[in-house]
Structure formats: C-alpha cells, structure tokens
C-alpha cells in the first residue's frame, strides 16, 4: 500500500507515449494498458498518428478507458475549420485535446471548443512550452495568451515544468483552471518542479517512463520523488480542481 | 494558349486539399493529379492525415511529383524532438513543410530545420494567419515572429491573404523569402489580394477550387482574376524568388 502522498502523487503523473519509429507503436500501446490503471492517464499525439495512424490513437484511448485521463496532443494550431475537421475525426474516445492559445478566439478556438464540447471532450490550451525557444515569443506574449485563455475558458492549460515560475504565474492568473506541465525528465524538469513549486495539477513525463524497461516502477519512482518534495500540497490540493 | 500574365498567375496558385470526411480523400487525391500539372502545386495537412493516414499524404506527394510544389501543412508547433519525429516519418516526398514561427529557435525550429535539410525539404514558417483570431496574439507579436524567421532563415513564410497589409510588412522585412498566402476564397480574401497588394509569391486556395465540380477551370478562373489585377507584377516578379 503506497503512503497517502505517493498514492496521490502517482495520480498526478500523465505518461506521454510518443513512438520514435514504427516498431515502438505496439510496445507503447502495451504500455498504455500497464500505466493507465496506475498513473493519471496518457497523452498521445502526432508521432503516434504519423507512425500508427488514427487506429493507434483510437486503440490508446480504448486501452485507457476508465483508467485515467486520455489526452490527445496534436498541438492544434490552424484556422477553426481545419482544427474542427481534425477534432471531429480524431478526438472521439479522448477526455481532452490540446491546442495552442496563440491561435486566438475568433475564427479559431471558438470553433474548436464548440466541436469538443459536442464530443464531450475538454479543451486544453498551451500558454507556454517546455523548450528554451518558448522564451523567444511565447513567454514575452504570455499576457496575451492568458487573455485568450480567460476568454476561451478551457478546462486546462499547459505550462512548462522546466520553468516553474511560469507555472506559478499561470496558476495566479487562472486559479481554477487545471494546469498540465510537460518537461519532466528528458527535457530537464525534475519531478515535482511544476506541482510543488508552481502549483500545477499534473506533470507529464515521457521518455523517463516510456523509455524504461519497467514503466510502472519508473512511474512510481516519479511519484515517490514528487511525494517526498511536497506531501502536504498533494494531500490538500489547494486549487480544488485536482483530477476529476 | 493562356495570355502570359494568366500563364504566370496560374503558376502562383497552390491548391489546398483538405478532406472534410473519409469519402473526400480519394476525390481529392484524384484532384491532385488534375491540378498539379496546371497550378503551382498542392498543400495537404492534418485533415488528409487524419482521414487518409500517412498513405494518403504519401500518395498526394507521389501524384504531384514533377508537377509543382508539394507542401506538407501540419502546422508543426511542438518541441523540437516531437517535430523532428513527425518530419522524419511524414515529410518524405514533400518539397516543403509548414511549422509555426512562435515555437522559437532554441530546442524547437533549429531541430526541425536540420531534419528537413537532411530530407531535402524546405521549411516554411507561419508568421501570421488568415482567420480573425490572428489579430489577438500573432499580429501583436509579429515583430518577434519575424525575428525568429530571420534567425531560422526558412525558404518561405506564411502570411494571410485576408490581411494584405500584413503580407506587405512581411515582404518589407524579409525581401528574399518566399511568401505563401492562404485565405483566398472561402475565408474572404480575393484572388490577387496577397500577390498584387502584398507582394506574396503564392496564393493558397482551398474550397474555392477543391470544392468545385471542375477544379481546373476554377483554378484558371482564380489565375485570370489575379492576372487582371496586376499583370505587370506577375511578369516582372520583383523579388526574383518566384517559384523554383
């Protein structure tokens, strides 16, 4: 039996399943079955679509049904008409779909939100990214991105575990919006950086778990690391908008 | 035989082939064969991938080989690692691939450019979009987006035919970079708005041609409209970076 904080922490870790080659697709789909019952859920996107087709996306969503959040991460960033077509054909079976806030509301995200609402899927908007290039345009324009997020009212936003100060600023601006934070592990963020330091609800881990020979142990290891850093925060999630 | 300006204009019109449902995929692939020898080329993206799989993307590129520009438009907007995976698995056979300038250089576009260079494909960066939402974040941050474009040095950039003044500003800032302008037709831009008023090299037309029962005639109609507006500009392309 996990100590309470570890049990709570593991439910805050989403595993990103991004195949690097066709041979990875089946291995990562098998992994979905393993990690789904343990962690917060899974995230699949363009690499899975490119290498495994829409069938692999649908299979990932099916395997994780009832086992946590199923996040479709195509980083949608086109005009409303095109994002709508993509959402209609790909987001069935997913709990949430990720798009970019910088696309803007008019003729863009307003159409996507309507489509996702109709499919019972939640919208997550990227307001900052985990790689260094995010400092060049996204971060200087964060105020405008947060203004779009306030207008669109997504269920969640993405802010980077690699820069917890950005997560903290997003949390301050959007106190009741769920924050998902990629960038833990291969990209340099340490488990707990976003949840403990920034106030995020979820951390997204990719290669650190998906590249492990024993993904469930690796996932537990991430959770233990987070739990050791901020047990009180995990047990008394201040935002009240923890995973539902 | 087309009058010279019409002959030149038709070589400046790229047809976007975006299926709205699975049944459209084959029809649009057949259309690729028709329009490729006539216009400047084709653009396919997420709807074709979602509804026809990577096989449909590859088929579109194959059908248009030697018949003009083949542009892959996934609006890539992720960290470098993910964009690299997508480019490696999908951009073979394409002449150019579109990504978003706002992703930034470090850990983002620098990796994508290297991958595309290795595949012999050219990078096109979106610096502004054709829908009204582009006024909310992208346009106010255009200076920063153009700075990223100057650093990345893509073969081309995307700027909207729906706002020719933005095209003109991009042309002024990036005098030798090819400008591709979507937004003609269904989105409200008139043929020639980007080329004649803004100095773009190509206009991208989607449903106006792809939705026509006679796409080649519709394509010629667009070209005649452009040619009537600025014959001299077409015949003496000032930027010298006309389609090559």
UniProtKB/Swiss-Prot annotation, chains A, B:
Its EC number is 4.1.1.23. One of its GO terms (molecular function) is orotidine-5'-phosphate decarboxylase activity. It catalyses: orotidine 5'-phosphate + H(+) = UMP + CO2. The active site is at 75 (proton donor). GO terms for cellular component: cytosol. It comes from the Archaea. Pfam families: OMPdecase. GO terms for biological process: 'de novo' pyrimidine nucleobase biosynthetic process; 'de novo' UMP biosynthetic process. Keywords: Decarboxylase, Lyase, Pyrimidine biosynthesis. Pathway: Pyrimidine metabolism; UMP biosynthesis via de novo pathway; UMP from orotate: step 2/2. Substrate binds at residues 18, 43, 73-82, 130, 182-192, 206-207. Homodimer. This is Orotidine 5'-phosphate decarboxylase. It comes from Aeropyrum pernix (strain ATCC 700893 / DSM 11879 / JCM 9820 / NBRC 100138 / K1). The gene is pyrF.
């Amino acid at each position: 039996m996990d100590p309470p904080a570890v049990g709570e922490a593991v439910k805050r870790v989403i595993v990103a399943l991004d195949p690097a080659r066709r041979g990875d697709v089946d291995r990562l789909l098998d992994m979905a079955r393993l990690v789904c019952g343990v962690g917060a859920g899974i995230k699949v996107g363009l690499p899975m679509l490119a290498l495994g087709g829409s069938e692999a996306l649908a299979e990932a969503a099916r395997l994780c049904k009832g086992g946590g959040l199923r996040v479709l991460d195509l980083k949608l960033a086109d005009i409303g008409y095109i994002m709508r077509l993509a959402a209609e054909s790909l987001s069935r079976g997913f709990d949430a779909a990720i798009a970019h806030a910088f696309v803007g509301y008019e003729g863009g995200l307003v159409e996507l939100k309507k489509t996702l609402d109709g499919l019972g899927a939640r919208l997550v908007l990227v307001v900052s990214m985990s790689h260094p290039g995010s400092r060049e345009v996204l971060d200087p324009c964060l105020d405008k991105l947060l203004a779009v997020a306030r207008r669109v009212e997504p269920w969640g936003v993405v802010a980077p575990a690699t820069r917890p100060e950005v997560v903290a600023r997003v949390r301050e601006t959007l106190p009741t919006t769920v924050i998902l934070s990629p960038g833990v592990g291969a990209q340099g963020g340490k488990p707990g950086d976003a949840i403990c330091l920034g106030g995020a609800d979820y951390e997204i881990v990719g290669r650190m778990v998906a590249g492990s020979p024993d993904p469930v142990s690796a996932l537990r290891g991430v959770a233990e690391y987070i739990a050791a850093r901020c047990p009180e925060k995990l047990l008394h999630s201040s935002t009240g908008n923890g995973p539902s």
